[in-house]
Amino acid sequence: MFRAALNLFRLWGVSDVQAAKLLDLNGRTYARWKTGDLGRIGRDGKARLSNLIGIHKALRILFRDPGRGYLWIKAPNDAFDGESALAVMLGGDLTDLMRVRRYLDAERGGW
C-alpha cells in the first residue's frame, strides 16, 4: 500500500515534505521508507494509507479524466472554505484526511 501511496503522491504533485506530513512521518523516516526500508507500519499509518487510497479511488470514480482528479486535490474548494483538499489534509491529523474522504464519498454517493 505504501508503494501505491508513493505513486499517488507523484500523480498529485506532492512534495516529499508534504508526503511525510500526510503520513505523519519525519523526513528522515519518509526518505528511508522511500528506499524500501519500511519498518513497521502502525495502526495510524495504515489508516492514513487507507484514507489516501480511498480518496484516490473516489476521485477516479468522480472524474472520468484522471488528470482532473489530480488537479482537484490542489484546487480551492468551497466545501473546505476555499482551501484545497491538499491544504486540509496537510493539517496533519488523521481526521483531516478522513474529512476529505468523507466529502468525496458523499459526492459519489458512497455513503
Question: Where are the model-predicted features located?
Answer:
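Non-transmembrane "mature" sequence context
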Residues: 1-111
